[in-house]
């Protein structure tokens, strides 16, 4: 398994992924394996599970290299968040049918996040998870009366640790956390988690999207 962490607020979206690849058959590990992609100013995604399965799900939107992981394509993708999500979920539905009829078995635990045109959102996609995540797709948004919403593809203990650290920071600061503070929380999760979960390391890659208001316009970068 791997760990992908994603968090959204009113103005920022942050995603991170560890960089350890585990050969399930031999239990060998190696590093330098990228698991997150920023497709454009509105769309990011991260993958866990069997990388071949995720490369099929996101085919055409990134390269998959067995040594280096998921890499940005040379193409510039001028595609909206909603259109991208529709394409990926249509593929997922076909894979789900194959999985349920035993035509093919998948191991997917992926996250898409970004701006849907009006607000930031996170979508979790799971199929045949080896750690017991329920199959299906879940879309989450930040509640109006709460400062953030997070989703994690990984062990339940990692999720609990993230929430404990995030809420501790909010009680301490009494204000919105910065991108740097979110990155620090994610780093602390893997610093601790890599001590008991040998499928992850504490070398994180990060991608971010910021919502900026300028001269009456709303920009994303």
Language-model-derived ranges and their functions:
Residues 1-221:
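N-terminal nucleophile
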């Amino acid at each position: 398994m791997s760990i992908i962490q994603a968090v959204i607020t009113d103005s920022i979206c942050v995603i991170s992924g560890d960089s350890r690849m585990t050969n399930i058959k031999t239990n060998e590990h190696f590093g330098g394996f990228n698991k997150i992609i920023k497709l454009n100013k509105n769309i990011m995604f991260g993958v866990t599970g069997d990388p071949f399965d995720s490369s099929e799900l996101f085919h055409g939107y990134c390269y998959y290299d067995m040594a280096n992981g998921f890499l940005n394509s040379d193409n510039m993708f001028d595609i909206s968040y909603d259109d991208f999500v529709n394409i990926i979920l249509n593929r997922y539905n076909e894979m789900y049918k194959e999985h349920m009829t035993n035509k093919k078995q998948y191991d997917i635990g992926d996250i898409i996040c970004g701006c849907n045109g009006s607000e930031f959102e996170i979508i979790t996609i799971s199929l045949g998870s080896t750690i017991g995540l329920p199959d299906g797709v879940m879309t989450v948004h930040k509640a109006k009366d709460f400062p953030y919403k997070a989703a994690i593809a990984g062990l339940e203990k990692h999720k609990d640790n993230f929430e404990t650290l995030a809420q501790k920071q909010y009680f301490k600061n009494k204000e919105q956390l910065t991108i740097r503070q979110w990155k620090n929380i994610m780093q602390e999760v893997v610093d601790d988690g890599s001590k008991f979960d040998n499928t992850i390391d504490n070398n994180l890659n990060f991608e971010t999207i910021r919502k900026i208001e300028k001269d009456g316009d709303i920009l994303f970068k």
